[in-house]
């Protein structure tokens, strides 16, 4: 049997330390997000489960699966559908499917008619979301942890638990970010 060289042992130990550090940092980040989110942990879990259930229900429809690109976001039981479909009928069917999922209290259908966007536009959307979140984070007018940001084809969608004043400020901040074509809000208002 061949023994491991001291260098192999050292490299293995360093790699394992990196894995442990990544796991600890990742767990801390998730814990911090859960702690600062205004929703209860139970509601956060319910929303995550709702997203999975809606995605699963949509993926069972062969035409939607083949012809449309739909992303699902859930917040406080409200479901936001964004993406592209070739026609209004398919978009309406996606909304009906989402409404039939247990736990979906309300469905916002923001699916646009057209061809699904490509990887380049999807990457740009991720960058826009990052810029919007950064601007919200530095704002004194909005508690950024109360706002969920989704971007699709340059359109920014905002959801969350906010005051009316925070909602206006968040929409204004998002609208000023370069690359944003439009801002749509679906907030739940708190007093």
Swiss-Prot record:
Changing residue 19 to A: Cannot localize to the outer membrane. Changing residue 75 to A: Loss of activity. Mutant cannot grow on 4.8% SDS. GO terms for cellular component: cell division site; cell outer membrane. A lipid is attached at residue 19 (S-diacylglycerol cysteine). Residues 1-18 form the signal peptide. Keywords: Cell outer membrane, Lipoprotein, Membrane, Palmitate, Repeat, Signal. InterPro entries: BON_dom, Lipoprotein_DolP, Transpt-assoc_nodulatn_dom_bac. It is a lipid-anchor. Its main location: membrane. It is found in: Cell outer membrane. A lipid is attached at residue 19 (N-palmitoyl cysteine). Changing residue 137 to E: Loss of activity. Disruption phenotype: Mutants grow and divide normally on LB medium. However, mutants show severe growth defects under cell envelope stresses. Loss of the gene increases membrane fluidity. Disruption results in susceptibility to vancomycin, SDS, cholate and deoxycholate. EnvC-dolP, amiA-dolP, ftsE-dolP and ftsX-dolP double mutants show a chaining phenotype. Changing residue 83 to V: Loss of activity. Mutant cannot grow on 4.8% SDS. Changing residue 127 to E: Loss of activity. Abolishes binding to phosphatidylglycerol micelles and localization to the division site. Interacts with the BAM complex by associating with outer membrane-assembled BamA. Interacts weakly with the amidase AmiC and potentially with AmiA, but does not interact with NlpD. Composed of two BON domains that form an interconnected opposing pair. The N-terminal BON domain interacts with BamA. The C-terminal BON domain binds anionic phospholipids through an extensive membrane:protein interface. Belongs to the lipoprotein DolP family. Plays an important role in maintaining outer membrane integrity. Supports proper folding and function of BamA under envelope stress conditions. Binds specifically to anionic phospholipids via the BON 2 domain. This interaction is essential for function and guides the protein to the cell division site. It was reported that DolP is a potential upstream regulator of the amidase activator NlpD. However, later studies suggest that DolP affects cell division and may impact daughter cell separation, but likely not as a regulator of NlpD. This is Outer membrane lipoprotein DolP. The lineage of its organism: Bacteria, Pseudomonadati, Pseudomonadota, Gammaproteobacteria, Enterobacterales.
């Amino acid at each position: 049997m061949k023994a491991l060289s001291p260098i192999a042992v050292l490299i293995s130990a360093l790699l394992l330390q990196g894995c442990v550090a990544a796991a600890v940092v990742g767990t801390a980040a998730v814990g911090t997000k859960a702690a600062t989110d205004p929703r209860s942990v139970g509601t956060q879990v319910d929303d995550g489960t709702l997203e999975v259930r809606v995605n699963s229900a949509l993926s069972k429809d062969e035409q939607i699966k083949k012809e449309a690109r739909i992303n699902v976001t859930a917040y406080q039981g409200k479901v936001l559908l964004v993406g592209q479909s070739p026609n209004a009928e398919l978009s309406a069917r996606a909304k009906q499917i989402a409404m039939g999922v247990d736990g979906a209290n309300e469905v916002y259908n923001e699916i646009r008619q057209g061809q699904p966007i490509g990887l380049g536009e999807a990457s740009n959307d991720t960058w826009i979301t990052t810029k919007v979140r950064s601007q919200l984070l530095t704002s004194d007018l909005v508690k950024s942890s109360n706002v969920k940001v989704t971007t699709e084809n340059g359109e920014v969608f905002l959801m969350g638990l906010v005051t009316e004043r925070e909602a206006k400020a968040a929409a204004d901040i998002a609208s000023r970010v370069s690359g944003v074509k439009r801002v749509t809000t679906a907030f739940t208002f708190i007093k």
